[in-house]
């Protein structure tokens, strides 16, 4: 697709192996607004070998609203500058990311963004940056990160950021991911942070 477009707009979405969605700037690869009684089974399923590629300027790879969505993604995600991989704005959402290939981002991106205070995110993807001002995971819910985050480039990169009383956990009893972040530019308030909670204007 071109700019200002939607690749798929629906409720239950399944992308099989070798499936590919590519959209341009200010666009959405997959938008789902499903309402479900439970998040027990995947409502958006992206198989291993599938690819989602989005352009720059507020594009989103997978955008979900609704209730009790269950997003299971093994897709390769390619994100343009000033854009998002996953955006969750529903309630009771479960997002599981388990892609085998590393995800590389440039500048001003957010790999996973969630305003769902009742949601859960588990990330196993390895994230790598080549630029500045990127967020790995920004969430109001519960996050478990099980993938390395290599954000050592540029300035002002943040591994995980928790808001609205959310909770972020790096690793478990068997997996111990490494978060590497960039330098800070204090003059311009661009801080390299591994994990942080809350919000400040200072």
Which stretches of residues belong to each language-model region?
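Long amphipathic alpha-helical scaffold regions
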Residues: 161-167, 180-182, 197
């Amino acid at each position: 697709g071109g700019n200002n477009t939607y690749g798929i707009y629906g409720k239950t979405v399944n992308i099989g192996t070798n499936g590919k969605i590519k959209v341009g700037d200010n666009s959405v690869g997959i938008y789902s607004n499903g309402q479900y009684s439970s998040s027990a089974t995947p409502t958006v399923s992206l198989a291993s070998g599938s690819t989602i590629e989005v352009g720059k300027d507020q594009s989103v790879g997978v955008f979900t609203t609704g209730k009790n969505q269950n997003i299971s993604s093994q897709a390769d995600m390619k994100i343009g500058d000033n854009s998002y991989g996953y955006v969750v704005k529903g309630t009771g959402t479960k997002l599981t990311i388990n892609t085998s290939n590393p995800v590389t981002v440039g500048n001003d991106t957010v790999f996973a963004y969630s305003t769902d205070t009742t949601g859960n995110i588990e990330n196993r993807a390895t994230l790598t940056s080549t630029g500045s001002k990127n967020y790995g995971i920004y969430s109001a819910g519960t996050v478990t990160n099980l993938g390395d985050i290599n954000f050592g480039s540029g300035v002002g990169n943040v591994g995980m950021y928790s808001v609205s009383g959310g909770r972020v956990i790096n690793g478990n009893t068997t997996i111990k991911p490494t978060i590497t972040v960039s330098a800070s530019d204090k003059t311009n308030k661009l801080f390299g942070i591994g994990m942080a909670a809350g919000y400040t204007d200072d």
